[in-house]
Regions:
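Soluble non-cytosolic domains of exported or imported proteins
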Residues: 4-8, 37, 101, 131-134
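Intrinsically disordered, low-complexity, charged/polar segments
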Residues: 282-294
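Alpha/beta-hydrolase active-site loop
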Residues: 2-25, 31-33
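Short glycine-enriched nucleophile-adjacent loop
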Residues: 40-51
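The feature captures the conserved acid-bearing segment of alpha/beta-hydrolase catalytic domains
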Residues: 55-141
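Alpha/beta-hydrolase-fold serine-hydrolase catalytic core, especially in secreted/extracellular enzymes
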Residues: 117, 125-256
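Short beta-strand immediately N-terminal to the catalytic nucleophile in serine-hydrolase-like folds
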Residues: 33-35, 60
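Short, solvent-exposed secondary-structure boundary/capping segments
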Residues: 265-268
Length: 296
């Protein structure tokens, strides 16, 4: 919102970046705003204020446009009567960890209120809040590539009726419960879709819609096995001590005063925020990931 100074800060930042980098086009180049978790509301609001700068929108493990459940925990920004994201391709990715029908409903309602919006949904089944698997990386990359091919530097507004539809997965009204049902109706061109249009989402083309359906078919009926694997009190370790994560095939650093020194081994290190932050200094997050099988 301009009242917060964010818009001015962004514009000054891009001018400064253009000057420092020598790339003058940075002041006008199309942008893909990307936000995660508490910042996942940002991409929608950025596009509403900067539609002529926005190539595509990606809200990752986040929320819907104009949601009442902002990840940062306070009220959303009011867009007013004239702002919208009509024709701007948008991708909302929700992991199974944070899946909640109350997160999806605002997106469905938004599409009814703004029928020219182009919102895709990917249920990142089996995923937690901080992990990002190769399949989802490739999915987001393909989405952005296809948007560029259709919009380019002209940033023409897309017509949703030129895309495809696919239904939304269904879950519980209790946050974090496993997905209860994936869409059974096959994806189809926008005007030929035979499922409920009020519970479906837009996809930029056939390949993207079928890829989404294939992701759902691959996980449908399998058991979700997200579990806490370690609760380590770092106060009992010294700088330089290491610990090993036994579970899973791969382990990744998320945050905290540790660094990865082996395939699944981490070392305690001095932390940028110091040692007197009660929330950050003495705890760390790591993720251990295992590929699914026929049942999980």
């Amino acid at each position: 919102s301009p009242t917060t100074g964010c818009q001015q800060t962004f514009e000054e930042m891009m001018v400064g970046l253009a000057g420092q980098s020598g790339h003058k086009e940075m002041t006008t180049v199309p942008i893909v705003p990307f936000g995660h978790s508490a910042q996942a509301t940002f991409p929608w609001n950025f596009a509403a204020w900067n539609p002529k700068r926005t190539l595509a929108i990606v809200s990752f493990h986040g929320d819907a446009p104009r949601t009442n459940l902002c990840g940062y925990g306070t009220a959303n920004v009011e867009w007013g009567r004239t702002r919208n994201i009509n024709g701007i391709p948008s991708l909302m990715v929700i992991g199974e960890y944070e899946w909640w029908q109350a997160r999806v409903r605002p997106a469905l309602a938004f599409q009814m209120m703004y029928p020219n919006s182009c919102i895709s949904l990917l249920c990142d089944a089996g995923s937690g809040h901080f992990d990002l698997c190769d399949a989802t990386i490739d999915y987001i990359g393909m989405f952005i590539q296809k948007v560029w091919e259709q919009r380019g530097e002209s940033l023409r507004r897309l017509n949703p009726s030129d895309g495809w539809r696919l239904g939304s997965p269904l879950g519980s009204d209790k946050e974090g419960d496993p997905i209860s049902a994936f869409p059974k109706e096959p994806p189809a061109p926008w005007t030929e879709y035979t499922g409920d249009p009020h519970t479906s989402f837009w996809y930029i083309d056939e390949e993207m819609a079928r890829l989404t359906a294939a992701r759902y078919a691959e996980t449908d009926g399998k058991e979700d096995v997200r579990k806490d694997i370690v609760n380590l009190d770092l106060q009992h370790l010294d700088i330089g001590d290491t610990f090993y994560v036994e579970q899973g095939e791969e382990a990744f650093y998320i945050c905290g005063p540790v660094r990865k020194v082996g395939e699944k081994t981490f070392e305690i290190i001095p932390y940028d925020c110091g040692l007197d932050n009660p929330k950050r200094s003495h705890s760390a997050w790591v993720a251990s990931v295992t590929e699914g099988d026929a049942t999980h």
